[in-house]
Amino acid sequence: MDLKNGSLVTEFILLGFFGRWELQIFFFVTFSLIYGATVMGNILIMVTVTCRSTLHSPLYFLLGNLSFLDMCLSTATTPKMIIDLLTDHKTISVWGCVTQMFFMHFFGGAEMTLLIIMAFDRYVAICKPLHYRTIMSHKLLKGFAILSWIIGFLHSISQIVLTMNLPFCGHNVINNIFCDLPLVIKLACIETYTLELFVIADSGLLSFTCFILLLVSYIVILVSVPKKSSHGLSKALSTLSAHIIVVTLFFGPCIFIYVWPFSSLASNKTLAVFYTVITPLLNPSIYTLRNKKMQEAIRKLRFQYVSSAQNF
């Protein structure tokens, strides 16, 4: 970061959560348990999808990728946040802050794109079942996965490069639980209106566009299902309602933070917790662990592991 007015910013101070020491301990235990469950749940899904041949299908390939992105997104911010709950001086180096922002937007952008791809997969599976295997080929799936990572990278690097060149004059307090672009940009000692508009157009537009596309895809699926069977409609409603809950919890805070004008509202820590801590935990349970085929695969994998351990 640039030197300005004789003051070189080498670290930022994160205010984190306010409250008594007992409340900090409560948050520490709660977020530690949530993060542990998030990591274990997503690893379980990835291992099961990889090891069980019955799950080698387009849907579970995408779910495995989603689990990996969820785990990475949570890991980008949650461990540091948990550690800070036990310290009075909550600081992060400038480059640590930049790294945190890069990976958060990288994995977040990739996950948003992947959710669109998963909605397309569900549309093909429900509305064009006879052509599902032909359309969702292995080559297309690999291309989709690579595309989601490319979009996530471009989305993140385009904003981080501009932020890294900002001069900071000494004010280095961030009223949040982790580093995020809107709050870091506001600390710069130059006019950042153009950059703020760019962040709104980039992060805000990506979040809002993906959210609208997902809702439209769900509506199209529901409109198409009744032509086939009432049982199919009931099953689709059950599946999509759960998906909509997770999508809303993930995209809602993102849209509010990045589409809303840069103000104190952007520092709402509760919103930040939702899409970096809560949603990565909900995705395994709602998208995958409620799936009967996945549950059966996990049981068989556990039985196989126990049998191998006993024989050993």
Swiss-Prot record:
Glycans are attached at residues 5, 268. The keyword Membrane applies. SUPFAM superfamilies: Family A G protein-coupled receptor-like. Disulfide bonds join 97-189. It comes from the Eukaryota. It is found in: Cell membrane. PROSITE patterns: G_PROTEIN_RECEP_F1_1, G_PROTEIN_RECEP_F1_2. InterPro entries: GPCR_Rhodpsn (IPR000276), GPCR_Rhodpsn_7TM (IPR017452), Olfact_rcpt (IPR000725), Olfactory_Receptors (IPR050427). Gene3D superfamilies: Rhodopsin 7-helix transmembrane proteins (1.20.1070.10). GO terms for cellular component: plasma membrane. Residues 50-57, 121-139, 220-235, 290-312 are cytoplasmic. Odorant receptor. Belongs to the G-protein coupled receptor 1 family. PANTHER family: OLFACTORY RECEPTOR (PTHR48002). This is Olfactory receptor 4L1. It comes from Homo sapiens (Human).
